[in-house]
Amino acid sequence: MLRTLLKSKIHRATVTDCELHYEGSCAIDEDLLDAANLLENEQIHIWNINNGERFVTYAIRGERGTGIISVNGSAARRAAVGDLIIIAAFAQVPEAQLDGFKPQLVFVDANNRVQHQRSHIPVQAAAHPQEGRPS
């Protein structure tokens, strides 16, 4: 059996451009593609933190070192310059390979420069444990 797992994530990237009349896709700075282990033409999910929009497109190379994140084509209607987004990709992993599988998580600053990277998501604690719930 194959399991679909998070493979790559660029967290809180800032949209720098929206090009409605460009071919569809999302241009991503090549430094970020490399850091997140994303390939040109790879399917990506984009989740817009500002407006809640979620959509699927594919990655294309953006100029290295520029911080470009350009949402293109019809998807440009779902984002605006300055919006914060999460870019994610998934992989189908055979169960026999699950133990060694780790996602590549990339965290960026306001200029879309890599700040740090991780290969795990920490356990989320309850913000306000409810009284009376069993432990």
Curated annotation (Swiss-Prot):
Family statement drawn from the similarity comment of this UniProt entry: Belongs to the PanD family.
Chain residues that bind substrate: 57, 73-75
PANTHER family: ASPARTATE 1-DECARBOXYLASE
Disulfide bonds: none
E.C. numbers: 4.1.1.11
Origin species: Albidiferax ferrireducens (strain ATCC BAA-621 / DSM 15236 / T118)
Entry comment on modification after translation: Is synthesized initially as an inactive proenzyme, which is activated by self-cleavage at a specific serine bond to produce a beta-subunit with a hydroxyl group at its C-terminus and an alpha-subunit with a pyruvoyl group at its N-terminus.
Annotated cofactor note: Binds 1 pyruvoyl group covalently per subunit.
Gene name per UniProt: panD
Quaternary structure annotation from Swiss-Prot or TrEMBL: Heterooctamer of four alpha and four beta subunits.
Protein name (database record): Aspartate 1-decarboxylase
Location in or out of the cell: Cytoplasm
InterPro entries: Asp_de-COase-like_dom_sf (IPR009010), Asp_decarbox (IPR003190)
Main location class: cytoplasm
Molecular function per GO: aspartate 1-decarboxylase activity
GO biological process, one term: pantothenate biosynthetic process
EC class of the enzyme, as a word: lyase
Modification type Pyruvic acid (Ser): residues: 25
Pathway named in the protein's UniProt entry: Cofactor biosynthesis; (R)-pantothenate biosynthesis; beta-alanine from L-aspartate: step 1/1
Cofactor(s) demanded: pyruvate
Active-site residues annotated for this sequence: 25 (schiff-base intermediate with substrate), 58 (proton donor)
